[in-house]
Amino acid sequence: MPLQYLKLEVQDYVATVTLDRPPVNALGRGIREELLATFDELHDRDDVRVVVLTANGRTFCAGADIKERIKLTGRPGEYRELNRLTREVFHSVIQCSKPVIAAVNGAALGAGFAITLCCDLLIASEHAEFGMPEVDVGLAGGVKFLQRFFTPSQARMLLLTGRRVPAAELYRLGVLQAVVPASELMPQAMKLAREIAQKSPLAVQMLKVSFNAVENLSLEDGYRIEQDKTIELSKSEDAQEAGQAFVEKRKPVFKGR
């Protein structure tokens, strides 16, 4: 798909997806369709092992495009169709076979906050802030995403007040892996991405699948799935190469097989 609202670059097994819809990277229908198509593509690409999601401008993503939303005609099913597209965008990030690192350069609000919470790892610049301001425009949403990262009382506070929370607070709560100066955001995100890209791509993908699969399971059921994946991995060429490299005291050369 030709990209109008996104930029995609791939280098050394790392894909960088950049939101590029000025002025605030609001999620209109067009950019949602591009996000869905792009993450579906990255899911299948053998030359990609890690994805970095970031944005151009001072705002990471201001959330849904309210101006576009109020222009909906009221056609039966229209709102549900748009919401389904939104869900599929989120699922395409969560279910992408490659780890996704959010490099948040500014405000991430509403659906913009939600899409960062779909990522596997989050890094933010010092001036970034996060919030779910749907209540301020007479809407509601984001409950399930916040439940994955916040206590019930913290999630209720964010949802009921629409308050914005600075990056430093989310780092204190363990939601963010790092908060860095703006000039260091992409270098740090790329450093982390390259570190992960050096690992066995099969093992990394299995780890992500396991995390997603066991998140809401009992300890017994979750551990069984994890063990099954480990057995499957042990038969791979990458696992054999890693063992041989350990014996020979050299770095393994992974092929993703």
Segments from the language model and where they lie:
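Glycine- (often His-adjacent) and acidic-residue-rich active-site loop
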Residues: 33-34, 55-92, 108, 218
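C-terminal alpha-helix plus adjacent terminal tail
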Residues: 1-12, 21, 44-46, 162-168, ...
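Beta-strand-connecting loop/turn residues
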Residues: 12-13, 58, 128, 228
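Conserved CoA-thioester-binding segment of acyl-CoA-metabolizing enzymes
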Residues: 1-56, 91
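A secondary-structure boundary/capping signal
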Residues: 20, 54-56, 62, 105, ...
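Terminal peptide-recognition signature
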Residues: 17, 35, 53, 65, ...
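Crotonase-fold acyl-CoA enzyme core
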Residues: 92-202, 228, 235-236, 241-244, ...
